[in-house]
Amino acid sequence: MAENDEKAAEAARAAAPTPRPADCLPLFQAVSDRVFPRFAGVLGGQKPIIKVRDMRTRWGSCHPAKRQITLAARLALQPPEAVEYVVVHEYCHFVHPDHQAGFWALGASILPDWKARRALLRNAR
């Protein structure tokens, strides 16, 4: 029964229209506020700017020089664990701009189950 529930939830997310970016900002800001303390030292105590766009090919992006994280509006339709994964992933870019071993080690230290969370997004594409 649980498998059917998950399939139904996945179908509902796929059929749902992409939310408006402004409607997603409170959710993404709340997740960012929970993640920020782990990165406060790196960011000099200043929270990054969180922006939301209608992006089709990415879940998020990070612009360290601008102290800005941009998230896809469609991310709001994904499970909370997946949203948190993307936010942590983008925060990790403030420390490691690339996807080398240090980047993944930092992410794993914050979200040990990051691979399962990323899989939620890979299945949603």
Indicate where each model-derived feature is located.
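Active-site-proximal or metal-binding-adjacent scaffold patches in catalytic folds
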Residues: 1-85, 94-125
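Walker B catalytic acidic pair
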Residues: 90
